[in-house]
């Protein structure tokens, strides 16, 4: 990995955390609001959109194809003027997805059915190493043509728009990105499409596509069969993006671990396909209350109040993984402070995220004195050993950066963190919020 261009951030150990915090808008919902707004008729307004690097990459790609999207800044109401279901133009440049796997995978589905138009997608060095065939192969069953390095597995990727046919497609993994790419492609196919997942994954696309007017039905065991009939035009909507539970997870674990902590995380999305982290924290004995439950724009929302107390070790595997895949790094930190052995399995997907998150978390936490081992698809953590301050490195991964920040609060001495600015990918104000909540 290359060295940091910025100075390492100092992370002071000790103290406690008190107060209320509102985490940025949900990243998954932010991407989808921009994408669906761009292919709808009329104007879509988005409240609470995550003003971070990944959704900004999605917006830039859509602007390059003719959608009008107002500038994205913190607190802004975003306006998207859609071009209609088949109005995206062939861009005169390569579409740069930055560091965003969601942008690239959803774009593959969005663009596959743009008959007669040609698109090239690329990204940063990390994204160009992430597997894309898991989207390209199922799309090929609809007639899509995606080419790239490694037989279409790695960007840069070329998409030659085709007239797609409807089909029944089984996805190789329970992945909301794969499913959403197929649903986007199905909107302009000739004939209906049914996507069958091996296990349920987050369902933000289904909820939002229905709200925009798509002819979409969900059925089968545990809602694993999603069917789309093409032809229904999407209409611009007002979308309210709830806070991202994946960002809230850092405060939930910090509040449960740091002695004397008392935190309220406000306006958090509580979609049941995303709340696996709450189930695991409950299993650990964390003191978390859900307050002010409500529904906002078709998504369940609430405020989460957490106070500190002793935690028990945990064990979870592939059955819950789609509901908490992004929270594995911070739960690994939590396990370090539980007396006993915790087991994470079924998490091989984390080896192909922005980094190999299993390897990076093991490497960095061992630097602090943690006792943990990697397995091919997970981690075994023997908790209860005190962690020491250390020279740490996010290795460019936003979730690693924030997880290590929480670990450093509980270390016996101060730490430093290289490439701490990685947090901005999903949580630009994280470091400011941490400073404000510390007492």
UniProtKB/Swiss-Prot annotation:
GO terms for biological process: amino acid biosynthetic process; aromatic amino acid family biosynthetic process; chorismate biosynthetic process. Its EC number is 2.5.1.19. 3-phosphoshikimate binds at residues 27-28, 32, 175, 177, 326, 353. Pathway: Metabolic intermediate biosynthesis; chorismate biosynthesis; chorismate from D-erythrose 4-phosphate and phosphoenolpyruvate: step 6/7. Phosphoenolpyruvate binds at residues 27, 101, 130, 177, 357, 399. SUPFAM superfamilies: EPT/RTPC-like. It is an enzyme of class 2 (transferase). It is found in: Cytoplasm. GO terms for cellular component: cytoplasm. Keywords: Amino-acid biosynthesis, Aromatic amino acid biosynthesis, Cytoplasm, Transferase. PROSITE patterns: EPSP_SYNTHASE_1, EPSP_SYNTHASE_2. Belongs to the EPSP synthase family. Monomer. Catalyzes the transfer of the enolpyruvyl moiety of phosphoenolpyruvate (PEP) to the 5-hydroxyl of shikimate-3-phosphate (S3P) to produce enolpyruvyl shikimate-3-phosphate and inorganic phosphate. This is 3-phosphoshikimate 1-carboxyvinyltransferase.
